[in-house]
Amino acid sequence: MVDPGVSPGCVRFVTLEISPSMTMQGERLDAVVAEAVAGDRNALREVLETIRPIVVRYCRARVGTVERSGLSADDVAQEVCLATITALPRYRDRGRPFLAFLYGIAAHKVADAHRAAGRDRAYPAETLPERWSADAGPEQMAIEADSVTRMNELLEILPAKQREILILRVVVGLSAEETAAAVGSTTGAVRVAQHRALQRLKDEIVAAGDYA
């Protein structure tokens, strides 16, 4: 929710809130994946219905919603879902969340799409969530933007790994534990990277006077 007193184009801070729904969804997904691997068609359908919105959010954050030079986020998301379902019979639970396995496929497909488009880096996202959620903490804050262009510019100043962690935590909604498993890091390192990224964005906004 944007404060009435905030003028268009400005960015404001809101306190981070914990949202356990994504973690619960990840736990349910881990359980139903085992049933899908065993050949349960209803479980397979549930897996697809669960992962599709997650994949779409990730691809739109990494690719953008508008097709450029044949690059479409929704097309990439469809490829990710197809590749994931195709790989399910060979999937083995090795103690990592299934969302980490899904992220690996999604990151690979996004990289393929950028190579095909002749780009070395991700396009900025056209859409970002109105509310960001992460672990509560007095120094950790989320940023809402009326100007999507401004937010894209802010995200681009971050190192690639910090930007990726923010996308997984904020846009996709993974827990710190799930994000750590996805990027091959530790929960503590993810929280530190997230805090540093948010602090850098905050400092940039304050320095630019882009707040109310």
Curated annotation (Swiss-Prot):
Name by which UniProt lists this protein: ECF RNA polymerase sigma factor SigD
Entry remark concerning the domains of this protein: The sigma-70 factor domain-2 mediates sequence-specific interaction with the -10 element in promoter DNA, and plays an important role in melting the double-stranded DNA and the formation of the transcription bubble. The sigma-70 factor domain-2 mediates interaction with the RNA polymerase subunits RpoB and RpoC.
More details: Extracytoplasmic function sigma factors (ECF) are held in an inactive form by an anti-sigma factor until released by regulated intramembrane proteolysis (RIP). RIP occurs when an extracytoplasmic signal triggers a concerted proteolytic cascade to transmit information and elicit cellular responses. The membrane-spanning anti-sigma factor is first cut extracytoplasmically (site-1 protease, S1P), then within the membrane itself (site-2 protease, S2P), while cytoplasmic proteases finish degrading the regulatory protein, liberating SigD.
GO molecular function ontology, one term from the record: DNA binding
Record keywords: DNA-binding, Sigma factor, Transcription, Transcription regulation, Virulence
Gene: sigD
Family as reported in the entry's similarity comment: Belongs to the sigma-70 factor family. ECF subfamily.
Keyword Transcription: yes
Disrupted-gene phenotype: Not essential for growth in culture. Upon disruption about 260 genes show significantly decreased expression while about 200 showed increased expression. BALB/c mice infected with the disruption mutant showed a moderate but significant decrease in virulence, surviving about 30% longer than wild-type.
GO biological process, one term: DNA-templated transcription initiation
Residue segments, region Sigma-70 factor domain-2: 49-119
Region named Sigma-70 factor domain-4: 152-201
Lineage: Bacteria, Bacillati, Actinomycetota, Actinomycetes, Mycobacteriales
Species, as recorded: Mycobacterium tuberculosis (strain ATCC 25618 / H37Rv)
Entry function: Sigma factors are initiation factors that promote the attachment of RNA polymerase to specific initiation sites and are then released. Extracytoplasmic function (ECF) sigma factors are held in an inactive form by an anti-sigma factor until released by regulated intramembrane proteolysis.
Sequence motif Polymerase core binding, location on chain: 75-78
Cited InterPro entries: RNA_pol_sigma-70-like (IPR039425), RNA_pol_sigma-70_dom (IPR014284), RNA_pol_sigma70_ECF_CS (IPR000838), RNA_pol_sigma70_r2 (IPR007627), RNA_pol_sigma70_r4_t2 (IPR013249), RNA_pol_sigma_r2 (IPR013325), RNA_pol_sigma_r3/r4-like (IPR013324), WH-like_DNA-bd_sf (IPR036388)
